[in-house]
Amino acid sequence: MGDYGFGVLVQSNTGNKSAFPVRFHPHLQPPHHHQNATPNPAAFINNNTAANGSSAGSAWLFPAPATHNIQDEILGSEKAKSQQQEQQDPLEKQQLSPSPGQEAGILPETEKAKAEENPGDSSSENSNGKEKLRIESPVLTGFDYQEATGLGTSTQPLTSSASSLTGFSNWSAAIAPSSSTIINEDASFFHQGGVPGASANNGALLFQNFPHHVSPGFGGSFSPQIGPLSQHHPHHPHFQHHHSQHQQQRRSPASPHPPPFTHRSAAFNQLPHLANNLNKPPSPWSSYQSPSPTPSSSWSPGGGGYGGWGASQGRDHRRGLNGGITPLNSISPLKKNFASNHIQLQKYARPSSAFAPKSWMEDSLNRADNIFPFPERPRTFDMHSLESSLIDIMRAENDSIKGRLNYSYPGSDSSLLINARTYGRRRGQSSLFPMEDGFLDDGRGDQPLHSGLGSPHCFTHQNGERVERYSRKVFVGGLPPDIDEDEITASFRRFGPLIVDWPHKAESKSYFPPKGYAFLLFQDESSVQALIDACIEEDGKLYLCVSSPTIKDKPVQIRPWNLSDSDFVMDGSQPLDPRKTIFVGGVPRPLRAVELAMIMDRLYGGVCYAGIDTDPELKYPKGAGRVAFSNQQSYIAAISARFVQLQHGEIDKRVEVKPYVLDDQLCDECQGARCGGKFAPFFCANVTCLQYYCEYCWAAIHSRAGREFHKPLVKEGGDRPRHISFRWN
């Protein structure tokens, strides 16, 4: 028998038929054809489409019954080229305006897979569209030639899907609208026209294939080279979307973004913090700037998390006048990077002049705590983040700067209406906002600032007199065990005259603080502010290095009391009723009014005011507080509990709750008729009474059945409440 080969029958519009051999790629050849494939030159065979949209002919594989030699192959090849040149002009016109039959020839990947398994079925289903055989080309050796489905022509590979080998390819082609010239083997695949001249030159452009996550700047599902081509096909937007779902996104070599390193991807994926940074789009606040920014890459979305603030990109929250000051250290607010807890004093230069005014900008650059990370905030707005948020509340009656600040705190359904000053508690800062500089992130940071803002040495003046902001009593904790009173005095004497005190100092007759802490009683409030300026701030706490005979430069904690932390108004629209106020005993001294108010509001709701009792001379907390409710139900629920667990930060203490007893109330029964108009000495805290009684009315009312076991509450003279220095708006 003679030799058998395979040929392709091509039928054109003129009716001429020519058969010439075709050699298939080993990956794309059916299993039963491997032995019979002849090593002939590769060619691309395009089937023409009739004018009515139906297929004028099909390309089928058939066994050639007659033998042939090399001369027959040469003659057939030249004849095919001449026929293709004659058909080139009408073919280009037909490809520029695809017919509905061509649109219907686009199949999803699942149908392509079925077409590979059943060649006969796929050929019958694609009878309405153009067909092209994907054949090995010597020019494309080493490249996985990938056709752009829906770009220019709607061709369908009959043997294998092109996307099955894209993982091993680094190059792909961007097909121009007219691709019929690819059959010319002597045509070059690299044109000098570039992307803008692709349609004019009728050539193919080769671009590197990159993973979709490497080029986030282009955004969406459109690659760079698809954009120019899409201008020639505005009536087929679904082609590009369909094409982008089944093929990898392409990257132009001219793209400003760096190419990926595929050989490092495995190592990066093993490190979670590095793998996440590779897969996320760059933050608009990052240090890398694209040389040719596009609208889609200028504001690419960042990751989640504090994000709105850019925490994952190492964005520094400290901002200058116009947000353009580069920080000394870009420290993540959610990560600490200290090797030890020891603080070296030589890193921080103390100010030469304690009261020399300087600009807030200079102070922010020279601040000692600029090297330390920001205070750790496990929750965005909890009580720890409100440490210096509400400043000088109810003490700003004559201050010219007042504002209504809306702030939502955890567990609340409405925002807080706070009548507060706009400057911070210390160093001109306030942690009401995540940014420590206290400026709103809405463009208002450029407006003129108050003279008391920004510098730790600038004090607020009222009617020519300086307003006190701190108590003259300061807590000092973590003292060296061998330090005595004289050494403590010598360590803090440079800030001003002071007296060292600690609990039970007179009874103990000891020169050493028994529990490692003491109180500094300064003569002037300005000494406290000078002490604060000399401290080091870390995690929201102040430290100062103190030396003893055996320990040198030991950091001790400095805990001043801000006078604005004594009162907090949560709801200024509600009237303050003493009959709906509770007394909280045993309040830890670090707890502030804002924290006490939020704890009680979370437990019982309806809190409109909270206050910390302070001594009238030094204005330091005495260990008790008051909470006023806006409704009777919350008030009764609080006094019925009798005990409350105060939990905040390092504070976890069980405190007692009682009705707040006043000593200037008349008897609710006789209105002073039986007692001669004297104030009622007794108050019944039982929920069935909740009234003030004189001695006569108490005996008469509580002699009844069921009330004989009620116990009166007596307000002692020493616990007389101080005047509340605020007024309702």
Curated annotation (Swiss-Prot):
Biased amino acid composition, Basic residues: 24-35, 232-249
- Can you name one GO molecular function term for this protein? RNA binding
Modified residue annotations for Phosphoserine:
S97, S99, S137, S252, S255, S330, S332
Q: Which residues carry this modification: Phosphothreonine?
A: T326
What's the protein called, per UniProt?
A: Cytoplasmic polyadenylation element-binding protein 4
Q: Where is the composition biased (Gly residues)?
A: 301-311
What does the record note about the induction of this protein? Up-regulated in granular cells of the dentate gyrus of CA1 and CA3 after kainate-induced seizures. Up-regulated by high-fat-diet and aging-induced endoplasmic reticulum stress. Expression level fluctuation follows the circadian clock amplitude.
How are the domains described in the entry? The 2 RRM domains and the C-terminal region mediate interaction with CPE-containing RNA. The interdomain linker (564-579) acts as a hinge to fix the relative orientation of the 2 RRMs. The ZZ domain (509-566) coordinates 2 Zn ions and is probably implicated in mediating interactions with other proteins in addition to increasing the affinity of the RRMs for the CPEs. Unlike in CPEB1, a continuous polar interface is formed between the 2 RRMs.
Q: Which Gene3D superfamilies match?
A: 3.30.70.330, Cytoplasmic polyadenylation element-binding protein, ZZ domain (4.10.640.40)
The protein's site described by RNA-binding is found at K473
Keyword Metal-binding part of the UniProt annotation:
yes
What Pfam families does the database record attribute to this sequence? CEBP_ZZ, RRM_7
Q: Keyword set for this entry?
A: Cell projection, Cytoplasm, Endoplasmic reticulum, Metal-binding, Phosphoprotein, Repeat, RNA-binding, Synapse, Zinc
> Mind naming one GO cellular-component term on file for this protein?
synapse
Can you list the disulfide-bonded cysteine pairs?
none
Which residues of the sequence carry a binding annotation for Zn(2+) 2? C684, C689, H702, H710
What ranges does the record list as Low complexity composition bias? 83-96, 285-300
Domain RRM residue range list: 472-563, 580-662
Extract the PROSITE patterns matched here: RRM (PS50102)
Q: Name one GO biological process term.
A: response to ischemia
Entry function: Sequence-specific RNA-binding protein that binds to the cytoplasmic polyadenylation element (CPE), an uridine-rich sequence element (consensus sequence 5'-UUUUUAU-3') within the mRNA 3'-UTR. RNA binding results in a clear conformational change analogous to the Venus fly trap mechanism. Regulates activation of unfolded protein response (UPR) in the process of adaptation to ER stress in liver, by maintaining translation of CPE-regulated mRNAs in conditions in which global protein synthesis is inhibited.
**Knockout-associated phenotype:** No visible phenotype at young age or under unchallenged conditions. At 80 weeks or under high fat diet feeding conditions, mutant mice develop hepatosteatosis with excessive liver weight and accumulation of cytosolic lipid droplets sometimes accompanied by fibrosis.
Residue ranges of region RNA-binding? 541-543
| Source organism (scientific name) | Mus musculus (Mouse)
Stated family: Belongs to the RRM CPEB family.
What is the tissue localization of expression for this protein?
Answer: Highly expressed in brain, including hippocampus, amygdala, granule and Purkinje cells of the cerebellum (at protein level). Expressed in spinal cord (at protein level). Expressed in kidney, lung and heart (at protein level). Expressed in liver (at protein level). Expressed in spleen and testis (at protein level). Weakly expressed in ovary and in granular cells of dentate gyrus and the pyramidal cells of CA3 and CA1 of the hippocampus.
Tell me which residues are marked as the site Important for the positionning of RRM1 relative to RRM2: W561
